[in-house]
Structures are given as C-alpha cells and as structure tokens.
C-alpha cells in the first residue's frame, strides 16, 4: 500500500523559528514592515528624549562647566617666553610644522578639536623642554597622536606606521613611543585643555544655527595657530573674537550672549 505524504499546514505564528510554506495574504511581510516601523519610531523617540535631556543638563550645569573650562585653560597655556629661549628651533620653523600637522590631521580625518589640542601640547612641551631641530617634527607627531587618542574616535587614531610613513621614515618606530611617553611625563599627564572649538560650540548653542559663521570662525581660529602673537591668547577669548570677526566678514549682526559674553571685556573681544 503506497503511503501518501501529507503536506503540513502550519497556522500563522509570530516567531522567527516557524516558517510556513505560503504567505498568500502577505501576513509575514506586513508584520515585518510593522516591526521596522515600530523600531524607527522608537529610535526617533529615543533621539528626541536624549536631545531634551542633553539640553536640560547643559542648561543646568553650563555655568559650572564654563568655570571649570576657564580654570583648565589658564592652567594649560604654553609659556611663549620659555619657547623664545630655545636654542635650535626658531619661530620660522613652526608654520612648516603646523602645515605638516594640518595635512596629517586632514589625512586621518580627525576632529577639529584634535588639531587645536595637538598644537597646545606641542607648545607646552616646547615651553618646558629643550627641543632639538631634528626632533621637532617628532614632537609634533607625538602631540598629534596623544590628542587623537584623547578625544578622537579609536578607528581614526593614526598608527605609528602611518606617522612614520608621513615622516618619510625619518624616525624609528620606538622613537615615536618614547617621545609620546616623554611628552606625557613632561606635562604631568595633564592633557585636558579646553580648545577654541569647545568654546565655539557653547557660544553657537546660544544662537540660531549658522553653518557659515561656524566654519568661518573655525577657519579664523586655525589661521591664528600660525602666529606666535596669538599663542598666549586664551581659547575662550579667541573663540569669541573669531565669532565676532566671522559675523563681521559675513555681514551678520553681532549677537549678544548674556550668559557667556558678560565674562569678558567687550573691547578685548571686538
């Protein structure tokens, strides 16, 4: 007697472990679409809640954050007079090194604040140690490496091999590691320096978004890195001055910042 194989007919079940042979009514497709829609709505709600919490928290602690940033920026400024007495490195060499750092910063797609922090670490190290001309670029690479590790995404941090290649193999691998360690020890592991970009973000958060003003202010701040006269200028003052100049260049009206600008002399800023 020949046996007949009966095709099983499972009913609809909302599980990933049971499959039916047919979906003539499109039930599964509708359920999957509904799940994706629910996930998308949940993500939007989460982002909205996070933005509100971030805004409320920033408003609550803004003054405390600014106070801490001002203390830190004063404690982590380089001494231009100490750099002046360097025997081998001269001021005309600094723009060439900054060109190199800016190129490396762009090549590795690092955050804007990483560049400002790297230059701060470089100048602070040169304020405390005698730097030979042949090691000047090495100090710059070590400063960029430390700054990237401190505030950038892990996958963007340059490797020693990449830095060595950019330096045309002028330094051995272990020299980068040794210089990185020496910079950290010299600065007593105090890396956190409030950069111009940090103060720019705070100032811009108090006004309507304007990408052109932000980009222009950042560009002005980057250009100021090349001039030694701006080395002693506090990042907070530089940020406000860059914003004021950017608005003037772009023909934007000057904005009054009641909470933040009141801390500074308007004559210094403008």
Model regions and ranges:
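Acidic, Ser/Thr/Pro-rich regulatory low-complexity segments at or just upstream of the first helical elements
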Residues: 1-138, 145-202, 215-223, 249
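C-terminal region detector
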Residues: 3-5, 10, 224-240, 244-270
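Acidic, metal-ligating active-site segments
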Residues: 141-147, 239-243
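Short, mixed-charge aromatic SLiMs
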Residues: 164-177, 208-209, 261-270
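Alpha-helical scaffolds that organize eukaryotic protein assemblies
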Residues: 200-201, 212-216, 230, 237
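A glycine-rich beta-turn/hairpin centered on an aromatic-Pro dipeptide
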Residues: 205
């Amino acid at each position: 007697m020949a046996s007949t194989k009966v095709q099983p007919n499972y009913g609809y079940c909302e599980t990933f472990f049971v499959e039916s042979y047919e979906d003539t009514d499109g039930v599964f497709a509708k359920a999957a679409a509904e799940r994706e829609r629910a996930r998308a709505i949940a993500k939007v709600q989460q982002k909205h809640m996070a933005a509100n919490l971030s805004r409320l928290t920033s408003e609550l602690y803004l003054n405390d954050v600014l106070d801490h940033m001002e203390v830190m920026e004063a404690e982590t400024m380089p001494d231009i007079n100490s750099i002046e007495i360097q025997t081998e490195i001269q001021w005309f060499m600094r723009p060439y090194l900054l060109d190199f750092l800016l190129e490396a910063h762009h090549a590795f797609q690092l955050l804007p604040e990483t560049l400002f922090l790297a230059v701060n670490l470089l100048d602070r190290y040169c304020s405390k140690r005698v730097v030979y001309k042949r090691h000047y670029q090495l100090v710059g690479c070590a400063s960029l490496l430390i700054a990237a590790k401190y505030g950038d995404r892990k996958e963007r941090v340059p490797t020693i091999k990449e830095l060595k290649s950019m330096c045309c193999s002028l330094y051995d691998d272990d020299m980068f590691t040794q210089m990185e360690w020496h910079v950290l020890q010299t600065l007593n592991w105090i890396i956190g320096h409030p950069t111009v970009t940090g103060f720019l973000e705070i100032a811009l958060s108090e006004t309507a978004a304007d990408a052109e003003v932000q980009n222009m202010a950042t560009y002005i701040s980057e250009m100021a890195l090349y001039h030694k006269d701006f080395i002693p200028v506090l990042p907070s003052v530089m940020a406000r001055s860059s914003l004021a100049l950017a608005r003037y260049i772009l023909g934007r009206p000057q904005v009054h910042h009641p909470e933040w600008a009141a801390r500074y002399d308007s004559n210094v800023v403008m």
